[in-house]
Amino acid sequence: LDPQVSYTGRRNFVNTYEASGTYHLTGEKQITGRDFQTGDSFTFQVTGEEDAPMPDKVDADGKLTIEPTSGKTAALDFGTMTFDHAGTYTYQVTEESKDANGVISDSTEYTVKVTVKDANDGTLTANAEITGGEGDAVVFTNVYAPGAAALDGNANLKVTKELTGGSRGWKEGDSFTFTL
């Protein structure tokens, strides 16, 4: 057998290589001091740097809202990021602060650095390093402290200073400095 190929005119052959891979971003929401209850709502923000693909369960602004109604923990499922080329992708994950009804929000800012490597077989492998909190996972813990209030803006504060001991007494021009 002697195969021969002949062409009329010029022929171009273009080889393409496409690879893809995914990483699923999850976390946990915790509350201490009480259980979650009907009406609780927590919003989280995912911000990707440069051309980082966003997780598929956040909205167009990178936000995810959950409304747990019981228990002390709730799953956070930000969704899957789909990558089409190797590289390092960095994300910031935060909880929007809305201290209310004695619940104090967690202000931790997590950095999720996803390293995507090409396996040269049409697949990409993605591994994440999570920093910012305690451990290697995204965990936001709110604290319920009845009667606690987060002050924002102006607030009235009444303070009384009592001078005791000795016979010196309070004199005109005396002053004290208080630091809150």
Question: How should these model regions be labeled?
Answer:
Residues 1-180:
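Solvent-exposed loop/turn and edge beta-strand elements of beta-rich ligand-binding domains
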